[in-house]
Amino acid sequence: MAAARWGGGGGLPIGACLLFGKTAGVFSYGDHGTTFGGNPVACAGGVSIVERLTKDLLLEVQAKGDYLKTFILKMKGVETVTGMGLMLGIKINSDKSAREIAESCLRKGLMILTAHDRLRLLPPLNITKTEMNEGLKILNEVLAE
């Protein structure tokens, strides 16, 4: 199994190649590399994230995602909000493209991502309610323009 995640190392990119069973002995040390693998700082961040992953944290993340969805669905032009936890996709019905909306948000201090015609939110798991409210305010202002 291969895994790579931008931000999985506590905000830093990290990657891994995990081998099991018959494949466990296929690679020797140094035979294989990864763009995001082996960085000691990212690895320390990744270990910290894994150590903090508890049922309570995941329930908190789900609650934060539900909070965001509730407010985003009330915003002008929002058709749907999909996703799980804090990984959210927002389908917009607007004359502006998702990219234009994201650029307007960035100018006001909110960095969001896009995927084709959708806005994507990927805040850190430890985002505070105050930070969520600041982001929701900016997104609401931009969508209302």
Model-identified regions with their sequence ranges:
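Conserved N-terminal phosphate-binding loop of PLP-dependent enzymes in the Aspartate aminotransferase
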Residues: 1-145
